[in-house]
Amino acid sequence: MKMKINKVLSTLFLGLFVIIFAVKEAKAASSNGNNVLVCIDPGHQAKGNSQLEEQAPGSSVKKATVASGTRGTVTKKYEYELTLEVGLKLRNRLKEKGYRTFMIRETHNVNISNKERAIMTNKAGCTVYIRIHADSSHNSTVSGVSVLTSSSKNPHTKKVQKASDKLSRDVLSEFVKATGARNRGVSYRDDLTGTNWSTSVNTLIEMGFMSNPEEDRKMVSADYQNKMVTGIVNGIEKYLKER
């Protein structure tokens, strides 16, 4: 009788171990690709569009659909060029690691509003939505990286705000580790059309200031772009593992 009980207990423990192992493997598989879809939006485009669109669903406030962005003070590279370079490298790195990806644009000659970009990613069923941008300031000494997400008071982003906040913080911290860039923190913005229309967990990263000569030169270099991509990927993976 005792031997039978021991045998049953051994079988139960073995079964429990198998279940725990399977759950861990499933979580690992999910975080390393398979079911994960990363949507990448290289900010801006070659020509801005000043036509107006709703800032948020049902909002009476309207904004220009999309701008062409800023330009490097030294390199003269346009923001829309830089964001696509980094976006394509990010896509390639993620694919190498087994993730599925969805690009909002792969060329400069498009006309896609910020609202349309968000809706595209909603329809795609993104796990995370990464919006890539670069910053500018009248003060050429200003430098560093920041991330933008909605506040907890935003009625349009309630379902994803908390997760988006975590994704933003994870991407920011890992970006700073990978690049050594100055950490300018998280900016909570409720006036961003692309954020307000998104039903996916999302963040907008301002990778650096194109108005700062040193940072402008850095961001166009292949080596620094690879570091930026490493930081973004590490941030995405940190979020996926801890969500």
Segments from the language model and where they lie:
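Soluble non-cytosolic domains of exported or imported proteins
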Residues: K77-E85, H108-K115, K158-K166, M219-K227
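Active-site-adjacent mobile loop/cap segments within catalytic or ligand-binding domains
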Residues: C39, R131-N139, L148, N183-R243
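Solvent-exposed loop/turn segments at secondary-structure junctions
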Residues: H44-K47, E79, T107-N111, A134-N139, ...
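Mature extracellular/periplasmic domains of secretome proteins
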Residues: N114-T127, S146, L192-S198
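Active-site histidine-acidic residue metal-binding/catalytic motifs
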Residues: S30-A118, S151
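Sec-dependent N-terminal signal peptides of Gram-positive bacterial secreted proteins and lipoproteins
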Residues: K4-A28
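Extracellular/periplasmic catalytic domains that process cell-envelope and extracellular macromolecules
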Residues: S31-G33, K95-E96, N122-A124, N139-T141, ...
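Active-site-adjacent substrate-binding region
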Residues: V160-S187
